[in-house]
Amino acid sequence: MSNSIVIQTNSTVIEDMKQQYKHSLSPKTPQGGIFMAKVPSCTITAYKSGKVMFQGGRAEAEAARWQTVPQTPKIAVKKSVDSHRYAPPASIGTMSIVGSDEVGTGDFFGPMTVVAVYVDAKQIPLLKELGVKDSKNLNDEQITAIAKQLLHVVPYSSLVLHNEKYNELFDKGNNQGKLKALLHNKAITNLLAKIAPTKPEGVLIDQFTQPDTYYKYLAKQKQVQRENVYFATKGESVHLAVAAASILARYSFVKQFNELSKKAGMPLPKGAGKQVDIAAAKLIQKLGKERLPEFVKLHFANTEKAFRLLK
C-alpha cells in the first residue's frame, strides 16, 4: 500500500464511521480493533484507543473527510441513542408537526432523497385513513397510491441529491452523515418558509446520528433550524408527519430510480447486494467507467466489487 495515515478521534466519530462504511466492512477485525472497512484504494481500521488508520492510494483523501468531522468528548456513561435533550415530548403524536425523513442512503444506485412534511393535528385522522405508515412496510405500488393523495393534502419540501453531485460533495470531504444533515436542514427551512405564517408546534427529524453531531455538521450554515426541533429513531412511529415524509421520499426516489434505469438502458437493482455488483459491472461494460458517477455512490464497496467482476 502506497500511503498510511493515522488520526486520533473519539467513540462518537468512530460510530459514525462504522455506519458510513457499513456496506464495506470486512469480516476480519485486528486485535484491539473496532472495525475494518475496505473502500476503493483505501483500507480503514478503527481501534478501541480512538486511533483510525487509513492505508492505500486514497488514504489521504479518505482521512481528510474525517479530520473535518466535528469531534465531541467521550461520554463516560454509555447512553441510548434516544437519550438526549432533543427527545420529543410524550404528547408529540397529537401535535401539529413538521417531520423529515430520507431514503436512498443505503442504495448503491440512485440518489439520496430527503422530504419534510407539515401535518396539522386535525389532519392526523385523514392520514390514518389514507394508510400512512412507515414506507418500509409498503411496496412501491402502495407507496405510489398513497403518495399521489398526500401530495394534495399536506405541504411538503422535497430535495434530491443526484449521484454526480453526491460524489462531488463526498470527494470534497463531506461524509454521508453530513450530507443528510444538510439536506434535512434545507428541506425543513424550505417548508417553514412555505407554510409561514403558520408555525408548527415542533419539528421531528428521523434520527440518523446524535443531535449534537447533527448540529456540528451544520456549523457553517447560515440558516439552521433549532426551535422546538426533536430527534427520534423510528420517527415514523412517533408522528405521522415523519411517516408521510418517508412515503413521499420513497415515492420520489422510486420515480428517480426508474428514470435512472431508462438512462442506463437496463433495469437497475436497489440495495447494495451481489446483484448490484453484477448490474454495475454490466453498466461499466455498456457505457464505460467514465459514466459510472452518474448512476452510483462511488464510495460504496460495490464499486470495487464491480470492477473485480470485469477482470
Curated annotation (Swiss-Prot):
GO terms for molecular function: magnesium ion binding; RNA binding; RNA-DNA hybrid ribonuclease activity. It catalyses: Endonucleolytic cleavage to 5'-phosphomonoester. Manganese or magnesium. Binds 1 divalent metal ion per monomer in the absence of substrate. May bind a second metal ion after substrate binding. It is found in: Cytoplasm. GO terms for biological process: DNA replication, removal of RNA primer; mismatch repair. GO terms for cellular component: cytoplasm; ribonuclease H2 complex. Disulfide bonds: none annotated. A divalent metal cation binds at residues 101-102, 206. Residues 95-311 form the RNase H type-2 domain. Keywords: Cytoplasm, Endonuclease, Hydrolase, Magnesium, Metal-binding, Nuclease. Its EC number is 3.1.26.4. This is Ribonuclease HIII.
